[in-house]
C-alpha cells in the first residue's frame, strides 16, 4: 500500500483554515513591535541635541536636519523654532510623508521633561526613522536662551 502525500497535507491545511487567528498572531505582551518584529523588553532611549547645537545647525543652514514641533497647530502657527514643521503630539502618529528618513529629525515640545518629544521620537523610531533626536529642555530652554523664533504667516 502506497501512502498518498496529499493525505498528510490535508490535516495541516484544514488546521490553517479553521484555527483561530490568535493562533498565528505574534504575542508581544512584554515588548514592542520594532520594524514588524516583537522586541521583548524594548525600551526607547532617545538621543539628545542641545539648543546650542541646533542653533549652530540653523545658523549654518544645515540641509541635514528637520526640526519637528509637537505642539497643536494653533500654537505652532503662533510661534516656533525657525524652519520647524508641525507634527502634533498623538498617542499613535502615522508616518508623516513630509519627513525624510535620510535626515536627522530634531523633535521638541513645550512640556515638562521633554515628555511629548520623547514619545514622538519613540514613535518615529518605531516607524523606521533612524536619525531622531530630542531637543534637550525643548522650547522653554530655546526661549530662555533668547534664540530666534518665527510664526506662520
Which positions does each model-derived feature cover?
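Positively charged, proline/Ser/Thr-rich regional signature most characteristic
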Residues: 40-113, 119
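A generic alpha-helix preference that emphasizes hydrophobic side chains
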Residues: 20-22, 81, 139
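Short, surface-exposed amphipathic charged segments that create phosphate/polyanion-binding patches used
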Residues: 101-103, 147-151
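Flexible, polar/low-complexity N-terminal or interdomain linker segments that lie immediately upstream
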Residues: 2-9, 14-66, 75, 153
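Thiolate-centered catalytic microenvironments shared by cysteine-dependent enzyme domains
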Residues: 5, 24-43, 116-148
